[in-house]
């Protein structure tokens, strides 16, 4: 009857749900928050994995665009201004986060077309009268 019981059978190392799903975001922590938040009486096993994947994708998308904005401004560090520019210049992210205020984000540079100086017709040397 050797080998029976509840003792450790092998030295397998525990693998997190994040690692199983190939994610960087913590699936276990998100599951805990979903349970603690009382969003529903019960939470399915796949729900925190899916939510972690969605959050990771959105974060990667925003960071990619913010990194591009920082590089365009010849900076090595992403600051809130770069995140603001990234979100507001992207159509889909702008729609998703339209009502969100980003602290120290500033505003998009925009001059209404009516306020711009009028363009004159022709080029140089028109006034030869």
Swiss-Prot record:
Q: Which UniProt keywords apply?
A: Chromosome, DNA-binding, Nucleosome core, Nucleus
Coiled-coil blocks: none
Which SUPFAM superfamilies does this chain map to?
A: Histone-fold
InterPro entries from the UniProt entry: Histone-fold, Histone_H2A, Histone_H2A/H2B/H3, Histone_H2A_C, Histone_H2A_CS
Q: Which SMART domains match?
A: H2A
The answer to keyword DNA-binding applying to this record is: yes
Q: List the Pfam families hit by this protein, alphabetically.
A: Histone (PF00125), Histone_H2A_C (PF16211)
Q: Where in the cell is it found?
A: Nucleus; Chromosome
> Which GO terms fall under molecular function for this chain's record?
DNA binding; protein heterodimerization activity; structural constituent of chromatin
The family database entries (CDD domains) matched by this protein are listed as:
HFD_H2A (cd00074)
Keyword hit for Cytoplasm:
no
A GO CC annotation recorded here is: nucleus
Q: What is its main location?
A: nucleus
> Function of this protein?
Core component of nucleosome. Nucleosomes wrap and compact DNA into chromatin, limiting DNA accessibility to the cellular machineries which require DNA as a template. Histones thereby play a central role in transcription regulation, DNA repair, DNA replication and chromosomal stability. DNA accessibility is regulated via a complex set of post-translational modifications of histones, also called histone code, and nucleosome remodeling.
Quote the subunit structure annotation.
The nucleosome is a histone octamer containing two molecules each of H2A, H2B, H3 and H4 assembled in one H3-H4 heterotetramer and two H2A-H2B heterodimers. The octamer wraps approximately 147 bp of DNA.
Q: Which family does the entry's similarity section mention?
A: Belongs to the histone H2A family.
This protein is called what? Histone H2A
Name of encoding gene: H2A-II
């Amino acid at each position: 009857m050797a080998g029976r019981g509840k003792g450790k059978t092998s030295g397998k190392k525990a693998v997190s749900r994040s690692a199983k799903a190939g994610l960087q975001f913590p699936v276990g922590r998100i599951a805990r928050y979903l349970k603690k938040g009382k969003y529903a009486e019960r939470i399915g096993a796949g729900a925190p994995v899916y939510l972690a994947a969605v959050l990771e994708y959105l974060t990667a998308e925003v960071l990619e665009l913010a990194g591009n904005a920082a590089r365009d401004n010849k900076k090595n560090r992403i600051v809130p201004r770069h995140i603001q520019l990234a979100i507001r210049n992207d159509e889909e992210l702008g729609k998703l986060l339209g009502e969100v205020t980003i602290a120290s984000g500033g505003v998009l540079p925009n001059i209404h077309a009516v306020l711009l100086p009028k363009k004159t017709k022709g080029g140089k040397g028109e006034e030869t009268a």
